[in-house]
Amino acid sequence: MQFDVLTLFPDFFTSPLQSGLLGKALEKAIASVNLINPRDFTTDKHRRVDDEPYGGGVGMVIKPEPIFAAVESLPVLSKREVILMTPQGQPMDQALFRELTNYDQLVLICGHYEGVDERVCQLVTREVSLGDFVLTCGEIPALTLINGVIRLLPGTVGKEASLIAESFSTDLLDYPHYTRPPVFRGLAVPPVLLSGNHQAIAQWRLEQQEERTQQRRPDLWQKWQDRQPSP
């Protein structure tokens, strides 16, 4: 999979793209990330990418010309999405990450200042948000999306079965995890996890998932309930 990221701050991505599973996935060519600075597509000597908003108002708006030029300079692979990072977009979730793994190319446009000129939306096939809040830049949600999608690609995570059992893969939160020692400062590992009874362990984990989800995320619990077959 190819990620083409339009960003005014390419250095923002340097460390995360070289670290952990993400760095290893890029080394193994499971995915590639191409960083494009819209300033390289400006035509004035000051390399200006923003201007004042028509109609007045606070802040600056990213101009359409460098964004159009940057996107149009990219090769077009067979299955491509052009995604604008914006607070007005579709909130990210695990289902979105899974859907995006079906594409060959994701072009990510990182907003900044007061946002991008509305005409940029003519290039866009999807708008995506990190959540119901405003950040200083679109690089943070873009990096989140890159991480969330790449970790689902075959070969990124060593034990791919762990992707099935983790939080949100079934609308349930993850169950509690324990490792050695069996007792730490008076806190003991639940006996069922030491029993060797795999059926009992699986049942305990499901019960813990259901309890956690019901208590912490009633919205997800309702989705889980709605998906269960009628008795």
From Swiss-Prot:
Domain of life of the source: Bacteria
CDD domains membership: TrmD-like (cd18080)
Protein location: Cytoplasm
Single annotated GO MF: tRNA (guanine(37)-N1)-methyltransferase activity
Signal peptide from the UniProt entry: none
Keywords per UniProt: Cytoplasm, Methyltransferase, S-adenosyl-L-methionine, Transferase, tRNA processing
Annotated residues for binding of S-adenosyl-L-methionine: G111, L130, G131, D132, F133, V134, L135
Sequence segments annotated as region (Disordered): 210-231
Catalytic activity: guanosine(37) in tRNA + S-adenosyl-L-methionine = N(1)-methylguanosine(37) in tRNA + S-adenosyl-L-homocysteine + H(+)
Enzyme class: transferase
One Pfam family recorded for the sequence: tRNA_m1G_MT
E.C. code: 2.1.1.228
A GO term from the CC aspect: cytosol
Database matches in Gene3D superfamilies: 3.40.1280.10, tRNA(m1g37)methyltransferase, domain 2
A biological-process GO annotation: tRNA N1-guanine methylation
Function: Specifically methylates guanosine-37 in various tRNAs.
Family membership: Belongs to the RNA methyltransferase TrmD family.
Quaternary structure and partners: Homodimer.
Name recorded for this polypeptide: tRNA (guanine-N(1)-)-methyltransferase
Organism: Synechocystis sp. (strain ATCC 27184 / PCC 6803 / Kazusa)
Lineage of origin: Bacteria, Bacillati, Cyanobacteriota, Cyanophyceae, Synechococcales
